[in-house]
């Protein structure tokens, strides 16, 4: 684990001293090498400070795999920037990756909290410095306020747990039962921060703003990894805190399922492509929240599968939206129509990614949603109404997104250049792991 961490750390000075001509080739290939080395981390591993198990290893692997892809995706936009800013951008991306990986590796909740909150700063810089419109400052403010407001109770809860147990609380050990009132306050304090990060419907307003204003690398990292920190945190807290009573997690499950349905309905009325994909993330994370709250073996396996699947799928959708944006300079879906006759290969990628997003079998998205649906139905048969409605609307807006961007008459007031092999490679590296994991889901479940 330390080897991989040091390799990632050394990428920061590398980006700062490389020759301009070699900057992207070297950093991308170096980070691909780190991604391949990180495959060895799938085996459980533990020492005093760092700890990996079947919950954190797949998410850690996902974060390392997406790091070179964020560099590749932002290459076109970054080439227009001065060299020093390109170096700074790559360094901040690497720093963000370092904080994320240490969050997943941390063996005690204090270190996990510090790294969890440290991810805020690089993400904020990426959104507010490299975003496209002036609204990026508002998006950055929303992101910061939601994160900081909910993280204060989490810090208080962690300090209380540390004082009660007289240890930095290794994840293997469960806290002794205190009074019911204390338990309730601890759960609400811990869940607040992670639910805002997921985000649950109601605490989600920062997400569409951040996604729409962030550059492509920021959108990819936000959708694929930063949202998963919330799910990972909830799973970790269920291992430490005393077992939840049904009357506490019932409102959260209802809120997350109803929120998923409402987010899906919001998707149907979106005109902005990135905003639609962002609301789609809110609905998928609603299912993950519901699954983690039930705390059965099946539901946790389903939550893990859906988190990994959503990481690849949403990141791929943002890459495709960016490919369209680079050519049309607009995110409005009605202005980006008719791409099937201009870029037919990109239409194929759109179709495959949307099918993954709908969760058609035999994709890993389907495996995750099937496990979640089974555990929800077993827990309370009525939940199938909200779940089924959510699935139906997901299929509707995914097909609407595909048809409105790819079919129809092209707008003829723009010059469209052909796709680069870089963009095709980017899509292959998103979709290939999804297909391979679908063949062997026990790697992540």
UniProtKB/Swiss-Prot annotation:
<keyword id="KW-0679">Respiratory chain</keyword>
<dbReference type="InterPro" id="IPR010227">
    <property type="entry name" value="NADH_Q_OxRdtase_chainM/4"/>
</dbReference>
<keyword id="KW-0813">Transport</keyword>
<dbReference type="InterPro" id="IPR001750">
    <property type="entry name" value="ND/Mrp_TM"/>
</dbReference>
<dbReference type="GO" id="GO:0048039">
    <property type="term" value="F:ubiquinone binding"/>
</dbReference>
<comment type="function">
    <text>Core subunit of the mitochondrial membrane respiratory chain NADH dehydrogenase (Complex I) that is believed to belong to the minimal assembly required for catalysis. Complex I functions in the transfer of electrons from NADH to the respiratory chain. The immediate electron acceptor for the enzyme is believed to be ubiquinone.</text>
</comment>
<feature type="transmembrane region" description="Helical">
    <location>
        <begin position="332"/>
        <end position="352"/>
    </location>
</feature>
<feature type="transmembrane region" description="Helical">
    <location>
        <begin position="87"/>
        <end position="107"/>
    </location>
</feature>
<feature type="transmembrane region" description="Helical">
    <location>
        <begin position="141"/>
        <end position="161"/>
    </location>
</feature>
<keyword id="KW-0830">Ubiquinone</keyword>
<dbReference type="GO" id="GO:0015990">
    <property type="term" value="P:electron transport coupled proton transport"/>
</dbReference>
<feature type="transmembrane region" description="Helical">
    <location>
        <begin position="425"/>
        <end position="445"/>
    </location>
</feature>
<keyword id="KW-1278">Translocase</keyword>
<dbReference type="InterPro" id="IPR000260">
    <property type="entry name" value="NADH4_N"/>
</dbReference>
<protein>
    <recommendedName>
        <fullName>NADH-ubiquinone oxidoreductase chain 4</fullName>
        <ecNumber>7.1.1.2</ecNumber>
    </recommendedName>
</protein>
<keyword id="KW-0812">Transmembrane</keyword>
<feature type="transmembrane region" description="Helical">
    <location>
        <begin position="215"/>
        <end position="235"/>
    </location>
</feature>
<dbReference type="GO" id="GO:0008137">
    <property type="term" value="F:NADH dehydrogenase (ubiquinone) activity"/>
</dbReference>
<keyword id="KW-1133">Transmembrane helix</keyword>
<keyword id="KW-0472">Membrane</keyword>
<dbReference type="Pfam" id="PF01059">
    <property type="entry name" value="Oxidored_q5_N"/>
</dbReference>
<dbReference type="GO" id="GO:0031966">
    <property type="term" value="C:mitochondrial membrane"/>
</dbReference>
<keyword id="KW-0249">Electron transport</keyword>
<dbReference type="InterPro" id="IPR003918">
    <property type="entry name" value="NADH_UbQ_OxRdtase"/>
</dbReference>
<feature type="transmembrane region" description="Helical">
    <location>
        <begin position="54"/>
        <end position="74"/>
    </location>
</feature>
<feature type="transmembrane region" description="Helical">
    <location>
        <begin position="383"/>
        <end position="403"/>
    </location>
</feature>
<keyword id="KW-0496">Mitochondrion</keyword>
<feature type="transmembrane region" description="Helical">
    <location>
        <begin position="108"/>
        <end position="128"/>
    </location>
</feature>
<feature type="transmembrane region" description="Helical">
    <location>
        <begin position="22"/>
        <end position="42"/>
    </location>
</feature>
<comment type="similarity">
    <text>Belongs to the complex I subunit 4 family.</text>
</comment>
<feature type="transmembrane region" description="Helical">
    <location>
        <begin position="248"/>
        <end position="268"/>
    </location>
</feature>
<feature type="transmembrane region" description="Helical">
    <location>
        <begin position="300"/>
        <end position="320"/>
    </location>
</feature>
<dbReference type="GO" id="GO:0042773">
    <property type="term" value="P:ATP synthesis coupled electron transport"/>
</dbReference>
<feature type="transmembrane region" description="Helical">
    <location>
        <begin position="186"/>
        <end position="206"/>
    </location>
</feature>
<keyword id="KW-0520">NAD</keyword>
<feature type="transmembrane region" description="Helical">
    <location>
        <begin position="276"/>
        <end position="296"/>
    </location>
</feature>
<dbReference type="Pfam" id="PF00361">
    <property type="entry name" value="Proton_antipo_M"/>
</dbReference>
């Amino acid at each position: 684990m330390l080897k991989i961490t040091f390799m990632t750390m050394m990428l920061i000075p590398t980006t700062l001293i490389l020759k301009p001509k070699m900057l992207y080739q070297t950093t991308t290939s170096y980070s691909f090498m780190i991604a391949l080395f990180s495959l060895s981390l799938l085996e459980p591993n533990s020492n005093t400070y760092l700890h990996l198990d079947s919950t954190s290893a797949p998410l850690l692997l996902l974060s390392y795999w997406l790091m070179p892809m964020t560099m590749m995706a932002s290459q076109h936009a970054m080439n227009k920037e001065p060299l020093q800013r390109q170096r700074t951008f790559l360094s901040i991306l690497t720093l963000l990756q370092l904080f994320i990986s240490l969050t997943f590796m941390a063996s005690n909740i204090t270190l996990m909290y510090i790294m969890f909150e440290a991810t805020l700063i690089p993400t904020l810089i990426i959104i507010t410095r490299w975003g496209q419109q002036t609204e990026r400052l508002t998006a950055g403010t929303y992101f910061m306020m939601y994160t900081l407001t909910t993280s204060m109770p989490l810090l208080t809860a962690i300090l209380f747990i540390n004082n009660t147990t007289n240890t930095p609380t290794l994840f293997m050990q469960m806290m002794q039962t205190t009074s019911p009132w204390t338990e309730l306050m601890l759960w609400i304090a811990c869940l607040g921060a992670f639910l805002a990060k997921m985000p649950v419907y109601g605490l989600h307003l920062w997400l569409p703003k951040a996604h729409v204003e962030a550059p492509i690398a920021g959108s990819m990292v936000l959708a694929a990894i930063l949202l998963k920190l919330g799910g990972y945190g909830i799973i970790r807290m269920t291992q430490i805190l005393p077992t939840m009573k049904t009357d506490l997690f019932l409102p959260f499950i209802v809120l997350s399922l109803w929120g998923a349905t409402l987010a899906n309905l919001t998707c149907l009325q979106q005109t902005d492509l990135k905003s639609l994909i962002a609301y789609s993330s809110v609905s998928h994370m609603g299912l993950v929240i519901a699954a983690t709250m039930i705390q059965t073996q099946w539901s946790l396996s389903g939550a893990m599968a859906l988190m990994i699947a959503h990481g690849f799928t949403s990141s791929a959708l943002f890459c495709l939206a960016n490919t369209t944006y680079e050519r049309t300079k607009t995110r409005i879906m009605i202005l980006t129509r008719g791409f099937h006759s201009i870029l037919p290969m990109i239409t194929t990628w759109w179709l495959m990614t949307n099918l993954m997003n709908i969760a058609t079998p035999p994709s890993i998205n389907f495996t995750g949603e099937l496990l979640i649906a089974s555990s929800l139905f077993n827990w309370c048969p009525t939940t199938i109404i909200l779940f089924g409605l959510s699935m139906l609307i997901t299929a509707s807006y995914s097909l609407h997104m595909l048809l409105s961007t790819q079919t129809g008459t092209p707008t003829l007031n723009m010059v469209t250049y052909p796709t680069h092999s870089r963009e095709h490679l980017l899509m292959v590296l998103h979709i290939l792991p999804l297909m391979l994991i679908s063949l062997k889901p026990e790697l992540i479940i």
